[in-house]
Amino acid sequence: MGKLLSKIFGNKEMRILMLGLDAAGKTTILYKLKLGQSVTTIPTVGFNVETVTYKNVKFNVWDVGGQDKIRPLWRHYYTGTQGLIFVVDCADRDRIDEARTELHRIINDREMRDAIILIFANKQDLPDAMKPHEIQEKLGLTRIRDRNWYVQPSCATSGDGLSEGLIWLTSNHKL
């Protein structure tokens, strides 16, 4: 009944899992979307979950810590995920290969096979930040042909690119 009412009145929900290496900007993105302002963050041990409403879509966003010791726990959050937001620190060239390995580990899990993939190419405001086409190549996205993915340049602290990412999720998910 709830789904029927959602279809009639236009309220849609989407479960989003936001992952990425530690210090990529996941929590900053979550609270910039939720509160519209930058907040002081500390490394996430465990998770944060918030509902972000944008253009009559309720995004239930799960932001899970990215430290290497926590990453094995990520799979416990996969079930029911409709959209993956993978956040990359574009100024961290030393760990882009590590980010690629983790991204492919996530998307190759059978629980995540139906999730659409949004990459926030974050920290675009920093000098020498990798541009979206470079992120696309270094993450091995061009070889992924059977999945719906998109790279959105972003700056979590200013909010640049964040709403565009939500628009992409909304228009590419079968609600």
Curated annotation (Swiss-Prot):
GTP-binding protein involved in protein trafficking; may modulate vesicle budding and uncoating within the Golgi apparatus. Promotes cell movement and remodeling of the actin cytoskeleton during compound eye morphogenesis. Required for normal ethanol-induced tolerance and preference. Probably after Efa6-mediated activation, counteracts ethanol-induced sedation. The keyword Protein transport applies. CDD domains: Arf6. The gene is Arf6. Disruption phenotype: Results in enhances preference and sensitivity to alcohol. Fails to develop tolerance to repeated ethanol exposures. Conditional RNAi-mediated knockdown in the eye results in aberrant compound eye morphogenesis, with defective cell intercalation patterns associated with altered actin dynamics. This is ADP-ribosylation factor 6. Its main location: Golgi. Keywords: ER-Golgi transport, Golgi apparatus, GTP-binding, Lipoprotein, Myristate, Nucleotide-binding, Protein transport, Transport. Activation is generally mediated by a guanine exchange factor (GEF), while inactivation through hydrolysis of bound GTP is catalyzed by a GTPase activating protein (GAP). May be activated by Efa6. GO terms for molecular function: enzyme activator activity; GTP binding; GTPase activity.
